[in-house]
Swiss-Prot record:
Organism superkingdom: Eukaryota
Keyword entries, A-Z: Immunity, Innate immunity, Secreted, Signal
Source organism per UniProt: Drosophila melanogaster (Fruit fly)
Localization, UniProt: Secreted
Gene induction: By a variety of stressful conditions such as bacterial infection, heat shock, paraquat feeding and exposure to ultraviolet light.
A Gene Ontology biological process term: response to bacterium
InterPro entries: Turandot
Protein name (database record): Protein Turandot Z
A GO cellular component entry from the record: extracellular space
Protein role: A humoral factor that may play a role in stress tolerance.
Stated family: Belongs to the Turandot family.
């Protein structure tokens, strides 16, 4: 009997510690998402935008598919994330199948041949599409983390 009481006490403590750890992780991820969203809105650099997007995607991957998920919205976000990853994937410094980096790389290599307004338009496209992705994931996760 003494062993059963002691074991139940130990299990109760472990459950409390695990729950508290999850709450801290949730708070940390929520705070990090807020920081990344602010940085995304303030940054004017395409490379920084892509780095921010990958970090936000990492947080999204931790929480997608969990209880209270909106299956339709997650399917849309998953499609956007996969499209983004496909277009920005770099393997050994080389863009996979062109993508965004192929566009930017081609622009950088042929900098003298490409007008400045075309270079600027390509960078603006990268920045705006990345901001839209970050904002979509941010809005979804912040709504989900309130519960």
């Amino acid at each position: 009997m003494y062993f059963a009481i002691r074991l139940s006490f130990v299990l109760a403590v472990l459950i409390c510690l695990t729950g508290n750890g999850s709450a801290r992780m949730l708070d940390a991820d929520r705070n990090r998402l807020q920081q990344l969203q602010i940085r995304s809105q303030q940054s004017a650099d395409a490379n920084t935008q892509v780095d921010i997007a990958y970090e936000v995607i990492g947080i999204y991957d931790k929480y997608k598919g969990q209880g209270g998920s909106n299956v339709l919205r997650e399917a849309q976000l998953n499609s956007q994330v996969n499209d983004f990853k496909r277009k920005t994937m770099v393997i050994d410094g080389v863009p996979a199948q062109g993508g965004v980096w192929g566009i930017l790389g081609a622009i950088k290599k042929a900098a003298d041949a490409v007008p400045d307004n075309v270079k600027k338009d390509a960078e603006n496209l990268v920045k705006s599409s990345t901001k839209v992705l970050v904002r979509g994931i941010y809005d979804y996760l912040m709504g989900k983390m309130k519960h």
